[in-house]
From Swiss-Prot:
GO BP of this protein: translation
Source organism per UniProt: Blochmanniella pennsylvanica (strain BPEN)
Protein name: Small ribosomal subunit protein uS10
PROSITE patterns, alphabetized: RIBOSOMAL_S10
Quaternary structure note: Part of the 30S ribosomal subunit.
């Protein structure tokens, strides 16, 4: 697998889960002899919602909610066959979305 690159994008609502998962991925890749670039923190997406509290009147009574989507990027340069096998066997947290692309 020479001249290959594995790009891993992680998304999660909880920053502690995503940081824990990135540490596991980086340690696994380094243990198998691959060169790792990252984790690179990407911009956090903030979605804000405003909801009326009162069902009829009182337009001023509102609640505001926010959902933050944290993202990280990890590049694994020159992965070995052991690296790919170890990453496939890796068990990550349930709240983390993982996208893997080969390039």
């Amino acid at each position: 697998m020479q001249n290959q690159r594995i790009r891993i994008r992680l998304k999660a609502f909880d920053h502690r889960l995503i940081d824990k998962s990135t540490v596991e991925i980086v340690e696994t890749a380094k243990r198998t002899g691959a060169q790792v670039r990252g984790p690179i923190p990407l911009p956090t997406r903030k979605e804000r919602f405003t909801v009326l509290i009162s069902p009829h009147v009182n337009k001023d009574a509102r609640d505001q909610y926010e959902i933050r989507t944290h993202k990280r990027l990890i590049d694994i340069v020159e992965p070995t066959d052991k690296t790919v096998d170890a990453l496939m066997r890796l068990d990550l947290a349930a709240g983390v979305d993982v996208q893997i692309s080969l390039g």
